[in-house]
Amino acid sequence: MRNWVWVIVMAAGLQMNAWGQKVVSWDLLAVPYSTTPEGLYAPQFPSWLDSFKNQEVVLQGYLVPVDVATKQYALSRYAFSSCFFCGNAPPNTVVELVFKDQPDHLVTDQFVVVKGILVFNDDDPYRLFFIIQQAEFHG
């Protein structure tokens, strides 16, 4: 029974678009995590997520500034006022963006679709759980 639950979760969280890219939902990225004695978050990536590791994915969400001076942005499941950084959302609702080519101008809370390589961060507690490398706007 437990295996069927994971199959249903995976099916609900994954679609393929017309180009064969994996369209990932935020529900799929809602991995469990713990808090270290130092107060840092430590993600726990379930083994069924392994098929997404280092794969090209498509994800939609809101642009959230992490550091405007260095042009670091994240993609959030929620708008800025409700996201992990300013609201009460958990840390598994934001994804770090590393752009392939840095866009000239980004607008906070702009709803976008991003594609790139999904990287799992399980070793640097000062970065987000998921990183989309070679990110670019899609669609």
Task: Report each predicted region and the residues it spans.
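Positively charged n-region of N-terminal signal peptides that target proteins for export
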Residues: M1-W4
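Bacterial N-terminal signal peptides
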Residues: W6-Q15
